[in-house]
Amino acid sequence: MYPDYISAKKMKENYEGNVFSPMGCRSFLSPWKDENGNYKWEGRFNQGVVSLNLPQIGILAEGDMERFWQILDERLSICFEALMCRHKALEGTSSDVSPVHWQYGAIARLGKGEKIDKYLHGGYSTLSLGYIGLYEVTKLMTGESQTTEEGQKFALKLMRRLRTATDTWKETTGLGFGLYGTPEESLCSRFAEIDQKKFGSITDVTDKGYYTNSYHVDVREKIDAFDKFTFESQFQTISTGGCISYV
């Protein structure tokens, strides 16, 4: 087992003074209060994740920045529809499907046959927009790594665009949408393989056989651990629905 560390100081800044552990390695819930105004973290859950293939958008844009943002908006609309499909599929679910979760206290103590709907609304549970390949899409659109001045400017603009989308969805639906750095142990290779077959070998993009995890620095880049943490931290304050950094 490898250890995961959290920064209590930074968590307090990002999560309204709260410190709590993630679900799995990186999934963080948005702050939520009960009817008495008390924060609650235990017993909450995620309804589903849909992940954006950022490098593919960059490939399709062919260096045209206006076209890039247009395709991104189109893909975001599809992601929203997919997440809402997941949400609607869960509505009307009976607590009987998993008594240990819904009746015996793992998540709730509902009656037999009672619907779980109240836990799907109001931000109690989350719906996550994931993303993969910030390094590769930055390389495609700027010709540089996201660690350069120009690359960083584009990468941050893109991340903020994604965060604005989830914030807007949350405001308009009342559901707990969040931005989430996808844990891509298999998806990193799957997306890359799909694009390699469709678009061929592209230097620093499809030729590696994988895409870089979320907002992470390219694993081939020469950078020390502390500089890597410092650089990636600026993306963590945007991707508050799920984030992690590795050394």
Model-predicted regions and their roles:
Residues 1-123, 144, 148-247:
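Conserved catalytic cores of very large enzyme subunits
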